[in-house]
Amino acid sequence: MKKIMLIASAMSALSLPFSASAIELGEEGGLECGPYGKVGIVGGMITGAESTRLDSTDSEGKKHLSLTTGLPFGGTLAAGMTIAPGFRAELGVMYLRNISAEVEVGKGKVDSKGEIKADSGGGTDTPIRKRFKLTPPQPTIMPISIADRDVGVDTDILAQAAAGQPQLTVEQRAADRIAWLKNYAGIDYMVPDPQNPNARVINPVLLNITQGPPNVQPRPRQNLDILDHGQWRHLVVGVTALSHANKPSVTPVKVLSDKITKIYSDIKPFADIAGIDVPDTGLPNSASVEQIQSKMQELNDVLEDLRDSFDGYMGNAFANQIQLNFVMPQQAQQQQGQGQQQQAQATAQEAVAAAAVRLLNGNDQIAQLYKDLVKLQRHAGVKKAMEKLAAQQEEDAKNQGEGDCKQQQGASEKSKEGKGKETEFDLSMIVGQVKLYADLFTTESFSIYAGVGAGLAHTYGKIDDKDIKGHTGMVASGALGVAINAAEGVYVDLEGSYMHSFSKIEEKYSINPLMASVGVRYNF
């Protein structure tokens, strides 16, 4: 009996090596198809992943820091069936680890005088004055929820004073409506008149917002009477629509976390002088309502401790106690009361995070603290304390590396280069795919095959040293390989493949691996 072995195997870039069953031609020319199983090992490199951190030296703020990626490796397990001569179908799973990357951070070495030294190219260190400008986080306008819109529509005005009493102005009567516009839409009701700097006019932005019944087209531009409830209702609806059209590309939790991180980064030099610990962790994207509330209370306590530490150090500074008084929105409390439904939790989370962002937007207490810190920064005693602290930190860094000469030398070189390494992500993946394969060229000793596949990839691990919620997304792959007939019914498959991910992990990274695999296949 004459045998011609037709082999096809392929693994997906993060998934499975592929194999084929034996096809046996008997004396009558009959075709015998059969199942097969395969195990293998894989390794490769990561493509498609870009750092989320921007290069601070890029004036346009568009250049990302470069990533140094690890070499992922793992194992595969697959089962398949020859469905026709030269065509095979396979189902397999693969586990892959060490999907990691580090990012280069730091562009210079800070000396004890608070200056950055850069290599001038001539072997000498050229001091560059470090810019340390204190400015509060810029306001971020968050999408207005349906509940917040309804609150805005129902915002009433004050009645006019009785006859004989001082008459109230339009701004006094509509104070609550004006405050709603500022807090929820970031729009000032009155602005300086460009034709007369000493006068103020209604913000032209409000006049350009669509008003009136939506079925009337076109709707002409009209003056705004903020005391008129009908006009006010249409204005609130228009502002709400604009807030969703121009909403940030990231979640409210991420916006809040970035604001708090920025504040902590700004106050840390002063907190170090006062001996106050500043937290270095932000909010995870999956932060619960309780975590958001706790983070806001933590921020309040840190800022108040800092203010209290310098109270009395300078005249007319750090005098007013900081009380952010963050209160969870009423609609979020109602949504939490609905139970543990995932949708209700997500809606409550977004509402609470958005409310926290609005509290920090242009917060007078935080703005005053920043002004006081600017005054403190110019104080001779504080300058000397900062220089002493920087020198001590530099000395501690040097002493820490004295235990190992090689490590010290490497640290010195890194210091000269002005670069360090921080972990960007460290992930693992489990991939399952269904694949189809076809033989391209076949002999008795080997065959060349190609394949395509699709399936799901589940990713978990750490990003920026923080555990992430498991992410599952669609993937597709292509493979090209060689199957070698090693023994009766035993084949060795050598394969290269590429896998494309259709979704991003944590809305940041698209992991598209380029892989090579070695597998042993046995035909039953």
From Swiss-Prot:
Principal place of residence: membrane
One of the record's GO cellular component terms: plasma membrane
Pfam families: TSA
Membrane topology label: Multi-pass membrane protein
Cellular compartment(s): Cell membrane
Compositional bias (Basic and acidic residues): 395-405, 413-422
Transmembrane segments: 67-87, 472-492
Signal peptide limits: 1-22
Region Disordered: start-end pairs: 112-132, 387-422
Annotated SUPFAM superfamilies: OMPA-like
Entry keyword set: Cell membrane, Membrane, Signal, Transmembrane, Transmembrane helix, Virulence
NCBIfam families for the chain: Orientia_TSA56
Listed name of the protein: 56 kDa type-specific antigen
Source organism of this protein record: Orientia tsutsugamushi
